[in-house]
Amino acid sequence: MFITLEGPEGAGKSTNRDYLAARLREQGLDVVLTREPGGTPLAEKVRELLLAPSDEVMAADTELLLVFAARAQHLAQVIRPALARGAVVLCDRFTDATYAYQGGGRGLSVERIAALEQFVQGELRPDLTLVFDLPVEVGLARAAARGRLDRFEQEGQAFFEAVRQAYLQRARREPQRYDLLDAAQPLEAVQRAIDALLPGILERCRG
């Protein structure tokens, strides 16, 4: 089963990915934790290019192509092999993030992203996507509290409002794949919401 965790900056995706992994492992499941961009040594180098602040402005198309280049490597080396052996893959961001950040935030066309998605992924799509939603100002405050901001975190409020709306639109359009969680709540409340989803996730994993 392929589960992705999505959401804007400061939504707690990594923390909750680790929590969900622990809960699934308690049930004896083989769980692979990974992230995007990244997940392999080569893809992590691409991640550094994407996130590191630079004096050179990165063109939006360059950003998009780098994201999918890293994804192609990640799929080949980690995600597809893990799914083939029957593992549960938990990935912090995947292609929904591309539609949200490069589509919503950068304004690139959905058609262009979809063409690359088909080329790189074929028919592979997540089985379940958890979207951790919260107001932009809350997420940015959390990101700032972590320390130095990366290249994306330095974007303004309007960028992240567009990112958030893109996520919400995708979740509304395909409710059978997405579960929307209120990430503005205290962590314990978010994790109780994850616990409520566990029976359904376990049933699908074992189905």
UniProtKB/Swiss-Prot annotation:
Return the GO cellular component terms, semicolon-separated. cytosol
Q: Name one Pfam family in it.
A: Thymidylate_kin
Q: Which EC class is the enzyme in?
A: transferase
Entry annotated with the keyword Nucleotide-binding? yes
Any keyword Kinase?
yes
Q: Which domain of life is it from?
A: Bacteria
Q: What are the recorded Gene Ontology BP terms? A: dTDP biosynthetic process; dTTP biosynthetic process; dUDP biosynthetic process
GO terms for MF: ATP binding; dTMP kinase activity
Q: What is its EC number?
A: 2.7.4.9
> Which positions in this protein are listed as binding ATP?
7-14
**Gene3D superfamilies xref list:** P-loop containing nucleotide triphosphate hydrolases
UniProt KW keywords: ATP-binding, Kinase, Nucleotide biosynthesis, Nucleotide-binding, Transferase
Enumerate the catalysed reactions: dTMP + ATP = dTDP + ADP
Q: Which family does it belong to?
A: Belongs to the thymidylate kinase family.
Record function comment: Phosphorylation of dTMP to form dTDP in both de novo and salvage pathways of dTTP synthesis.
The UniProt entry, under PANTHER family, shows: THYMIDYLATE KINASE, UMP-CMP KINASE 2, MITOCHONDRIAL
Q: What name appears for this protein in its UniProt entry?
A: Thymidylate kinase
